[in-house]
Amino acid sequence: MLAPRGEARRKQLRTCALATGLGDKAVSLLYERVLRKERLELWIERCQAQISGVLDVLEKERAAVKTPYFFGERIGHADIAVACVLRFTGEAHAALFDAARYPALAAHSARCEALPPFAEIVQPLAPPSGD
């Protein structure tokens, strides 16, 4: 699901790193909003800016690709990582992942989530309550 070596592998790993970094920030933002009694607005703003920045980069890269998946005709690890983090980010922070602002990512997510393995294991977000 990843190229074995070379530039193709580095590009795929970069996309995976962007996706997992986005996930880290989305989780951090959720925790800050839900679990902390005294919210740090600076941290919230920083997380939101970083999330938006990564979404902008991924949107630009996905929009430039004319194949069904990021790196060709077959789904790869990067596609799965991006689709999963988009699901989480969209459920946890709907205002940050707007399909109108990120149409290529929204289409990518929909394409992946329409696949049987995604449909079989989908788990809607049940965030902590903070209690």
Residue ranges and their predicted role:
Residues 40-43, 47, 101:
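Residue-level preference for long, well-ordered alpha-helices that form the structural scaffold
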Residues 100-119:
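C-terminal end-helix/capping segment
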Residues 126-131:
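Carbohydrate-binding/catalytic loop surfaces
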Residues 44-64:
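Amphipathic alpha-helical packing segments from all-alpha helical-bundle domains
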Residues 70-95:
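GST superfamily/GST-like fold recognition
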Residues 3-11, 66-78:
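All-alpha amphipathic helical-bundle segments outside canonical DNA-binding/catalytic cores
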Residues 60-71, 116-122:
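Surface-exposed helix-capping loop/turn segments at secondary-structure junctions
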Residues 1-42:
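GST-like domain detector, emphasizing the conserved glutathione-binding G-site
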